[in-house]
Amino acid sequence: MILFVLPRFSGGGAERVTLNLLVELYNRGHSVGVIVFDRGGPLSHMVSDNIPIYNLDTLTLTRSIVSLVKKIRQLKPRVVFSTLGYVNVAILSIRWFLPQRTKIWIREANLPSISLPNSDHSKLMTFLYRFLYRRADKVICTSIRMKNEFISKFSISDSIMHILPNPVNVDLIRISFKTIERFDKGGVCYIAAGRLSFQKGFDRLLHWFSEINNKKSTLVILGDGSLKDELMREVKLLNIQNRVKFIGFCNNPWQWYAGADVFLLSSRWEGMPNSALEALACGTPVIATKESGGIDEIVKQGDTSITIVTGPQQFIYAMNNVKTRNKDSKNDSLLPDRYKQENATLIIEKWLNEISLKND
């Protein structure tokens, strides 16, 4: 069994990536399961009734440790797969209590050089990353840049470092927007999505949007989070409330992505932004900050559907250069093939085969 570990079925990119892998591996005949501390969350619908969900019903990580050890010892999985930093640290700290043959694969969702200084208890987390991550059987990165950071700044051995492109279910996305959603007032339609948090930079995006030339342009922001009230107050202060719409969490964000003229990524840090990859799958180009993680690697491969900018004025300039597109036609996917879900799953299957060969 490949046992995935998530706190809950939250609506974040890391959770969606994990569940995409879980479902695809199940569909390809692998034995899979998922441990959660709390069964709630907007992405719970992604897991079919046939996939085992082990709900510890402990709500928080600190209350989950003992139950987590017991459940893993009971299930004896071939692999435990975790993708959130604080959960990664916890699993690595208890691995001495886990079955000896169980492999620990941890996936990092954000660039640690930027995410850790902005995290709670940043000095402690930096120490734990350096001390514990080297004890994983695989440290899975979303980009070459992230892999190089772990090797150079955390002294992690290259032998356990691996790159796994974010898996995007292009087929599901493409059939999910038979009709599109578009907040149209006669100008360019911009779209942004993500947790309403400091990391995602929506506070600065609102200021940039307020400075663009075309005052008929609109901005839709998808997602929920702790800064929602603060961002809505900022919209009123900037006097752009008639041109900005907060949708909240959306089970089908892709119809909004497909209806927009461009996707805006204003993040202060990222690993590989899943929402931007999904926007490309919808045929929608992307404007991104230089801090937006590994997405710049797509640009380096010669892709022209992504514009990386180096500062606020360059972001505004890029926004001003966007043209409205044909609203009545479905645009072809702009996503490179390596990010398709089936290709990412093949990499995991290769790793699983390597385990089998070693055990034979």
Where are each of the predicted segments found?
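N-terminal strand-loop element at the rim of the active site
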Residues: 4-62, 153, 225-226
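Short hydrophobic beta-strand element within catalytic cores of glycosyltransferases
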Residues: 285-289
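A short, active-site helix/loop in glycosyltransferases that binds the activated sugar's phosphate group
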Residues: 134-160, 168-170
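Conserved acidic donor-binding segment of nucleotide-sugar-dependent glycosyltransferases
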Residues: 300-313, 320-326
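Membrane-proximal helix-turn-helix segments that form the acceptor-binding/catalytic region
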Residues: 69, 122-139
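Short His-centered aromatic/hydrophobic patch
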Residues: 82-89, 108
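A conserved mid-protein helix/loop that constitutes part of the nucleotide-sugar donor-binding site
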Residues: 12-20, 188, 192-211, 226-232, ...
